[in-house]
From Swiss-Prot:
Gene Ontology terms, MF aspect: RNA binding
Origin superkingdom: Eukaryota
Entry keyword annotation includes Ribonucleoprotein: no
Keyword RNA-binding listed: yes
Primary location group: plastid
Family membership: Belongs to the intron maturase 2 family. MatK subfamily.
Name the record gives this protein: Maturase K
Disulfide bond entries: none
Function of the molecule: Usually encoded in the trnK tRNA gene intron. Probably assists in splicing its own and other chloroplast group II introns.
Coiled-coil features, chain-numbered ranges: none
Entry's localization field: Plastid, Chloroplast
Amino acid sequence: MEEFQRYFELDRSQQHDLLYPLIFREYIYAFAHDHGLNRSDLLENVGYDNKSSLRIVKRFITRMYRQNHLIISANDSTQNKCFGYNKNLYSQMISEGFAVIVEIPFSLRLPPSGTEIVKYYNLQSIHSIFPFLEDKFPRLNYVLDVLIPYPIHLEILVQILRYWVKDASSLHLLRLFLHEYSNWNSFITTKKSISIFSKTNPRLFLFLYNSYACEYESILLFLRNQFSHLRLTSSGVFFERIYFYGKIKHPVEEVFANDFPAIRRVFKDPFMHYVRYQGKSFLVSKDTPLLMNKWKYYLVHLWQWHFYVWAQPGRIYINLLFKHSFGFLGYLSSVRQNLSLVRSQTLENSFIMDNAIKKLDTLAPISPLIGSLAKMQFCSALGHPVSKSTWTDSSDFSIINRFARICRNLSHYYSGSSKKKNLYRIKYILRLSCVKTLACKHKSTVRVFLKRFGSELLEEFFTEEEDVLSFIFPRTYSTFRSLYRGRVWYLDIVCINDLVNQE
């Protein structure tokens, strides 16, 4: 057990205990302000106006020195409903600045000398997920579809941070922020309170949730690494999507001290694959349903007894890869077998063998996309294009530009689809809806409008992704053309639209 105890040993020299004084530093709010400016235009900004200058910040810090603006009465709910509204500008600025401060102990954890770990400053980094989606799963049969439960009480999030943030004042301030979004005395935190918190201060919510998920995954992935034939020499690179810069070493040796040998015999699986994004994770294995059920109930007991989180076994599904598809990252994924006949010739005999090659198909989910377009009044519930009557007051250029931007974003996001048929259908709905909107504006039919202006009017704006690649790389167009027929993953798809967050 000495090896495992060293693995979970805390790096005391890396801990930083004085975070609370940073609240009075002007550059902290400049970082938070710059983070807000760099967010996607499609993400709703419900915070304060990002165009405010640092003059407001200086005035705010001066008032913090003179008065105690951090104390907010719990009975003052009528004046300060939530930090996200403009009624309490200073509290909103504190919460966004605090979100930058609590990331410092994690961001300063540099890898040991002699190792090279790529740093990704975006905490929503999904770069490690693409190799999972490109895997052929040659020996894997079952998938464990896991919905990670939320903590029933927000105090659990504060307790998790105590291992890293030793400043008691900062922890009390965090409790004050969380108190604004839920009744702290209540035993259960409602889903509505979590939703308000995630929309008002997404950076702080993302950090707290990643810290919570990281704690349980530090146990789960440690078990996975010990049983795998492909042990990793640098876990910080592969599990970058879970940890910020390196593997967080939490002292959980007491969990394995007594029953680790038994756990190792039960969960021995050399080909376990694991991936997570936000609140959904997958464990893919080649073993029997019995082992997958053991993993299922182990996760349930781990959440309930180690993290005091109520987990329902019904939120964890065991599916056969060849018969069930699973939704992940806004895609509908399933494993398909390609059968091919191979003839083997010897000196005397010849044999015909069936060779099955597995491939993970990633498709654009047609039904949810049509439902989203119908909700936005681009088509009917059956997928028939209709005119967008609310846009008829805009100019022709503005109408075409709006439709084209949606079409380009969808093409960019779903460029990783192994089959483009569903994507072409969605683009057809958007183009015909655009034509019907223009025809409605000019009080004519679609046929008359196209005869008058010609179909070339839309070609300039609805540029195919393949044509864009040919403009960027004209000399290697033939290579990119063959590449585009396959799957192309863009690393910025989370920032383009929030389809992935609507799962």
